[in-house]
Amino acid sequence: MKIQSNVIKIIIVISLLIGVGALYLLLSLRTPEKPLAGQVNIYEDNVKIGGDFELIDQNGEIFNSDKLKGNLSLIYFGFTSCPDICPTSLNKMTEIVEILNKHKIDILPVFITIDPKRDTPIALKEYLKHFHPKFIGLTGNEQQIKDVTDKFKVFYARVHGDDDDPNYMLDHSSFTYLIDANGKYLKHFYLDSSPKEMMEFLRNE
């Protein structure tokens, strides 16, 4: 009887472990983790990416999406206080522009802020001095930025600091969008995409 009792206890424990494991798996599948910078995915099937927008450039002038037409464009969403991801991506864009210019191909690099509170036209102008001189920096009010980020499926959220903290930080997706000469979305490149990968795609276009 003692052996039978021990067997029953073992069976109960195993059943409980299986139940807990199944519950954990179910919750994991139903509750996605908060995306980290550069890890958000864009599902292109039946999803329109891009669209018309009107913002303010680093010179304080109105800049709308029609001004992208006529040449290829690369668009990146970030903020000037970004410590590493944004500078890395903008440096890659600078490299791409320089390579294409050597082959007599014009491409316009565009940086759209997700932090309009701090990224004024003056702040953008100063920041973009560190990258290719062709860079266009765009800002606007919070609603304008929300509208354009929604159209490009951009994730961003405050992760450190509150409204009173001037040094708050943002987490955001890190894609570089390739726009064709008609102002239409062609493809997006990930944070870890190399300039070589981008060039290979452009050569095939």
UniProtKB/Swiss-Prot annotation:
Annotated keywords = Copper, Metal-binding
GO MF terms listed in the record are: metal ion binding
Q: Name the positions where Cu cation binds.
A: C82, C86, H172
Q: SUPFAM superfamilies, alphabetically?
A: Thioredoxin-like (SSF52833)
Highest taxon in the source lineage: Bacteria
Q: Where are the transmembrane segments?
A: none
InterPro entries, alphabetized = SCO1/SenC, Thioredoxin-like_sf
- Asked if Metal-binding is a keyword of the record, the answer is yes
Q: Does the keyword Iron apply?
A: no
Say which family it is in.
Answer: Belongs to the SCO1/2 family.
Name recorded for this polypeptide: SCO2-like protein RC0895
Native source organism of the sequence: Rickettsia conorii (strain ATCC VR-613 / Malish 7)
